[in-house]
Amino acid sequence: MVRKAGLIVNDGKELAVQTAISVQKKLEKSNYEVVRVSSSGGMVGFANPDQHVRPLGYSNCVPEGFDSSMEFAIVLGGDGTVLSAARQTAPAKIPILTINTGHLGFLAEAYLSNLEEAIDKLIIGKWDIEERKSLIISVMRNEQRRWESLCLNEMALHREPLTSMCHFEISIGRHAPVDISADGVILSTPTGSTAYSLSAGGPVITPDCPVVQLTPIAPHSLASRALVFNDSEPVTVFPATPERLVMVVDGNAGCYVWPEDRVLIRKSKHSVKFIRLEDHEFFQVLRNKLGWGLPHVGKPNK
């Protein structure tokens, strides 16, 4: 019986392309039909940020052949490739094995040094699934949905370039609206709490927490601090700035947002399914990849 697997590759990186060739051969020898696609299919909007419309919504990012018959997809690239691949697989409920051929690889499960072992475990089914929550980001004008994307990490909204103050009115569920003056705002998932939001002063959140966090970028008030709230509450961001803003989703999707637009952020029904070949303790991952909680090697003498 022929089984089906996907291969999502960062075609802009020679190392990822060469690795994909060997991985595809190995899968085909194990009687897999392999559907290979470029990770660029999950990048939405940046080629022409004025062109908002995704007529079929975020599910339009799912490549042809990626369906319920696919056992898994292997992602070859860095963290940006993984974020793009999430949009290509989550709506189809396809689990992904992330193999790092980039730099940090915070979202990577395996590396080139243990590639053969990882593929062997994958083929024999020696793996589990960890589900990560995602968001749906929509740009609305009146009742028209002008742009939409799935988001695994964060949505950032700011001026272009990021040089001057913006004003936002933000509505969270039934709570009173929040007014923020800052260089921009970030709405992130727990997965995204270790990315842009962390650099902007937001807290680290463990991946299993059902929350969203709002983090101002360089706020112009001591009262503006990161806010964490339940992910069941929809968020609407109203730009109160006369110039257009730039919205960036997961670092590789985005569009312009005009004063007459609003940005709607809501919990997605589609989680991103990560294949885990071994148990990962989250604090240990923080320690290994971000240096969190490391002991002081040398302390000053008294």
Curated annotation (Swiss-Prot):
List of catalytic residues: D79 (proton acceptor)
Location, primary (coarse class): cytoplasm
Gene Ontology terms: cellular component: cytoplasm
Compartment annotation: Cytoplasm
Reaction catalysed by this enzyme: NAD(+) + ATP = ADP + NADP(+) + H(+)
Pfam family, one: NAD_kinase_C
Coiled-coil portions: none
Gene Ontology MF: a single term: ATP binding
Residues annotated to bind NAD(+): D79, G80, N153, E154, D183, T194, A195, Y196, S197, L198, S199, A218, N252
Function: Involved in the regulation of the intracellular balance of NAD and NADP, and is a key enzyme in the biosynthesis of NADP. Catalyzes specifically the phosphorylation on 2'-hydroxyl of the adenosine moiety of NAD to yield NADP.
Family from the record: Belongs to the NAD kinase family.
Name of the protein in its database record: NAD kinase 2
Upper lineage: Bacteria, Bacillati, Cyanobacteriota, Cyanophyceae, Synechococcales
